[in-house]
Amino acid sequence: MSGEQTPMCSMDLPEVKVKTSMAGRCRVFWYEQYVQPCIVELVGSALFIFIGCLSVIENSPNTGLLQPALAHGLALGLIIATLGNISGGHFNPAVSLAVTVIGGLKTMLLIPYWISQLFGGLIGAALAKVVSPEERFWNASGAAFAIVQEQEQVAEALGIEIILTMLLVLAVCMGAVNEKTMGPLAPFSIGFSVIVDILAGGSISGACMNPARAFGPAVMAGYWDFHWIYWLGPLLAGLFVGLLIRLLIGDEKTRLILKSR
């Protein structure tokens, strides 16, 4: 008789295994779809802004805009190539806004991405402050954007931030999101757009193009003069580019109008 008896719980064991397996898969899916991308955006933003801030703080008069332009652009391209397949490689609230508008990022992830990018900016700027000599740090205003000093400069600074950010966001969206134009050289193109933007407009507005890049150093240095320019300009550019792609220049899958079906 004892050889024929079956434990009472044995009939439920397969169901328990199935439930456990499904729960495990759900946790992994939730982590990889929602948590891991935010972690990567935080880490990538911290690394990018650390390198960017350090390049400004340690810049010498002889190199002018070239050193920060190369450091920002090369760092961004490298980080996107390394981490982009996990989160999309935004590291910029303006980019995340544009990618959301064209359907490349779930709307529910936009705010978590922004929070991650801003915290990453704080961490990167804090690390740059820690490793920099105090005199150099304050001479460079902690790599905050201090180039706009008078009200008369606001219009041109805001305008150039919009235009420069549009070029960067176009490089991201068309090179890495839009299926018709995306390709393996996207990280290079995105990094190159940052180099070009800083060389072209750095003397006018500082060529920020990224609210997270402005926010972290502003907190560390306590410098908030005309800070709003570096939020409004890039975010407007992200919105404009998102609408441009969504309505006119995106592929058929992305466009909202003139679709064959």
UniProtKB/Swiss-Prot annotation:
Motif stretch (NPA 1): 92-94
Modification Cysteine persulfide, positions: 53
Induction record: Down-regulated by fasting.
Motif (NPA 2): 210-212
Tissues in which the UniProt entry reports expression: Expressed in placenta. Highly expressed in the epithelial layer of gall-bladders. Expressed in heart, kidney, submandibular gland, liver, small intestine, colon, testes, and epididymis. In testes, expressed in spermatogenic cells.
Compartment(s) of residence: Cell membrane; Mitochondrion inner membrane; Apical cell membrane; Basolateral cell membrane
Domain of life: Eukaryota
Protein task: Channel that allows the facilitated permeation of water and uncharged molecules, such as hydrogen peroxide and the neutral form of ammonia (NH3), through cellular membranes such as plasma membrane, inner mitochondrial membrane and endoplasmic reticulum membrane of several tissues. The transport of ammonia neutral form induces a parallel transport of proton, at alkaline pH when the concentration of ammonia is high. However, it is unclear whether the transport of proton takes place via the aquaporin or via an endogenous pathway.
Gene, per the UniProt record: Aqp8
Entry comment on modification after translation: Sulfenylation at Cys-53(C53-SOH) when hydrogen peroxide flows through the AQP8 channel, making it susceptible to hydrogen sulfide produced by CBS. Persulfidation at Cys-53 is required to gate AQP8 channel; under stress condition, hydrogen peroxide accumulates in the cell leading to CBS activation that produces hydrogen sulfide inducing persulfidation of oxidized Cys-53 (C53-SOH).
Stored InterPro entries: Aquaporin-like, Aquaporin_8, Aquaporin_transptr, MIP, MIP_CS
Sites bearing Cysteine sulfenic acid (-SOH), chain numbering: 53
Family, per entry: Belongs to the MIP/aquaporin (TC 1.A.8) family.
Name of this protein: Aquaporin-8
Domain notes: Aquaporins contain two tandem repeats each containing three membrane-spanning domains and a pore-forming loop with the signature motif Asn-Pro-Ala (NPA).
Segments on the Cytoplasmic side according to the record's topology features: 1-36, 106-107, 178-183, 250-261
Keywords: Cell membrane, Endoplasmic reticulum, Glycoprotein, Membrane, Mitochondrion, Mitochondrion inner membrane, Oxidation, Repeat, Transmembrane, Transmembrane helix, Transport
Ranges of the Extracellular topological domain: 58-84, 129-156, 205-228
Entry-listed glycosylation sites: 139
Catalytic activity of the protein: H2O(in) = H2O(out); urea(in) = urea(out); NH4(+)(in) = NH4(+)(out); H2O2(out) = H2O2(in)
